[in-house]
Amino acid sequence: VDIAIVGTGYVGLVSGACFAEMGITVYCVDTNAQKIEALKSGVIPIYEPNLDHLVLRNIEAGRLRFSTDLREVLNEGDVIFTAVGTPPDEDGSADLSYVLEVARTIGRNMQGYKLIVTKSTVPVGTAEKVRATIAQELETRGVTIDFDVASNPEFLKEGNAIDDFMKPDRVVVGVDSDRAKELMTQLYRPMLLNNFRVLFMDIPSAEMTKYAANAMLATRISFMNDIANLCEKVGADVSMVRQGIGSDTRIGNKFLYPGCGYGGSCFPKDVKALIATAHQKGYEMQVLEAVERVNEKQKNILFEKLSSYYQGELKGRKI
């Protein structure tokens, strides 16, 4: 199965290189011509351990190719992954304009069956919007071509992304047809042969799983920061408390370290998007809204402690 991946950011490039390493011919597409020319030369725009070697090896093997035009590679394979950005709108919801623009391009140019797989982090219902967008373009063209949509969210940790892809805890795949399931099974066959868990489910559940996972991890971080602040008030040692609760196999040790709050490119955006999705459906995510409030407050605590320690005189201090 040959595939195209639209978007050569963190998710798209790591996914493309890893699929190529599994023996699949991958066409990575991005509208940024400068980035594509750099990638063709083996210049990687992001840092991820061993990614540069993986990209170069698969370029030389002819399995990893780059293009600025989705129309050129659209009909090279049956599966197209969407890994474009979904930045937050003003209300915190995910902006799907890039995802739907890819869908429009596919609908305008596809000549035969395609499986369109969303790898970007997107709200529940996005696959149906992609389906409707492609169907509208096909109707405008006056043609009838079969296609399927699917969801295959990524669960990559920065600094460990290649291992996370090649040796995953699980691979989540949302499909709603036997043909789509068979194609995704072919793609992930090496992982199935190595007994890695590939979890097939309905598409809305797959879309929700990504948000729920990140929201759960963000919740643990805010919870431990709240506990750390209380420990300080009552004279307890939060590191001892962390060991005590982390030793419980129902809880475990991961994401139990207090600090200055969660950040980065995923957790804040995804928590806001999940809260926004709930609001759109008339539901209040009380726990997640508290998680967000704790996190916003936590950002200031370190600076408040510094200011208190130096009695407000921070100018010229070496921290």
Task: Please place each PLM-identified region on the residue numbering.
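Structural/interface elements that position substrates and couple domains in central-metabolism enzymes
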Residues: V1-I319
